[in-house]
Regions:
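FAD-site-proximal beta/loop scaffold in flavoenzymes
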Residues: 1-19, 103-179, 278
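General small-molecule cofactor/ligand-binding pocket signal
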Residues: 1, 77-79, 148, 225-227
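A short alpha-helix-loop-beta-strand transition element characteristic
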Residues: 128-131, 187-198, 223, 227
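A conserved FAD-binding loop/helix module that cradles the flavin
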Residues: 136, 150-212, 300-320
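Conserved beta-strand-loop-beta-strand element in the redox core of flavoprotein oxidoreductases
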Residues: 88-103
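Conserved SAM/SAH-binding loop
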Residues: 6, 81-85, 100-101
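Flexible, glycine-rich terminal cap/loop adjacent to redox cofactors
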Residues: 113, 206-210, 220-323
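Rossmann-like dinucleotide-binding cores of NAD(P)H-dependent redox enzymes
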Residues: 23, 29-86, 169-172, 195-215
Length: 323
């Protein structure tokens, strides 16, 4: 079974009602969220991912390990660094999922290994990335000004990497579709690119991300490093002062913030949006460390957790936390 659309997800839920053991191939957002869903419906779940850590395009290994541990604590088998080689028919309408070293008998397998752009119609007619994604300018025009493209078929400018990338996200598709409609008759509004801001709620924990990981920054030739923060999101005398864990990636030369990932039982999703806006305007760790943010014991510490992770980055570079 494939899982790409809402309707396909509903069909998968309906068809799994009489199944017991389900394999999920692909440990991105869809795979992890499906693993949670099937676990909550009392299925035995095995999650396969070819990379060494889950959600490797979005988060640092340290946070990926926490997600893996959470899934395993819930009874989900997580097989990272594992490539599914083949599927074979098993006894009693079961399916055998084969890797290089093992075989797993399941009732159903769900494949959610990512998207490829469906752009064959324009192959050879417009500029495309190596994976086939249609290259568009800031107005959603292709190299043929009479043809516009948007969403999962189109590229997008990644502001952190300063290059066109393939980033099939619903939020990006909505923005590109709106821009294409606005600009189809006249160039009225430009795209301002993306920081690739994403998030999910998994077993009561919030994961929120924006920008690049350290590995992505280093691969792009940026002199980058990262800093980690862990602390209560609000004063400990308040009830449910949940811990917030943050990984912050920044450029050591320019001191610009390049990426952030947050993990908490508290809803920290809007913090990723805050950092996205900061990165869009080339904000630095110095600015982040003291940027004005509200304080109330109901909401945060006197220094917001985003201030505090910025201050840790400044300390890492300068040798002091704050003066």
């Amino acid at each position: 079974k494939l899982c790409k659309t809402y309707e396909e997800a509903r069909d998968l839920c309906d068809e799994a009602q009489n199944d017991e053991r389900i394999a999920i191939i692909g440990g991105g957002y869809i795979g992890v969220e499906l693993a949670e869903g099937y676990n909550k419906s009392d299925h035995e779940v095995i999650l396969f991912h070819k990379k060494e850590t889950l959600l490797d395009r979005h988060i640092e290994p340290e946070i990926a390990d926490k997600i893996t541990n959470l899934l395993e604590d819930k009874g989900i088998q997580v097989k990272t660094g594992t490539i599914v080689k083949s599927f074979e028919d098993g006894a009693n309408d079961t399916l055998i999922v084969k890797t290089a070293d093992e075989a797993f008998e399941v009732d159903m397998a769900v494949i959610c290994t990512g998207l490829l752009p469906q752009a064959d119609l324009l192959q050879g007619k417009v500029d495309q990335l190596t994976n086939g994604a249609i290259v568009v300018n800031d107005y959603m025009e292709t190299s043929n000004p009479d043809i516009f493209a948007a969403g999962d078929a189109a590229s997008v400018k990644h502001n952190g990497l300063q290059t066109d990338v393939y980033m099939p996200l619903a939020s990006q598709a909505v923005r590109q579709g709106a821009l294409a409609g606005i600009n189809v008759l006249d160039k009225r509004l430009r795209s301002i690119g993306t920081q690739s801001t994403t998030g999910m709620l998994i077993f009561g924990r919030t994961l929120a991300c924006s920008g690049v990981t350290l590995a992505m920054a280093l691969d792009a030739g940026i002199n980058a490093t990262k800093v980690a923060y862990k602390g209560s999101y609000r004063p400990d005398f308040m009830p449910n002062a949940h811990k917030v864990e943050i990984e912050l990636v920044y450029d050591r030369n320019s001191r610009k913030v390049l990426g952030v990932q947050l993990w908490s039982k508290h809803d920290v999703s809007q913090a990723a949006d805050t950092i996205s806006a900061l990165m869009h305007y080339h904000g630095t760790i110095d600015e982040l460390s003291f940027v004005d943010m509200l304080f109330s014991p109901n909401f945060d510490q006197p220094f917001n957790y985003l201030n505090l992770v910025g201050q840790l980055a400044v300390k890492q570079e300068n040798g002091y936390l704050r003066t």
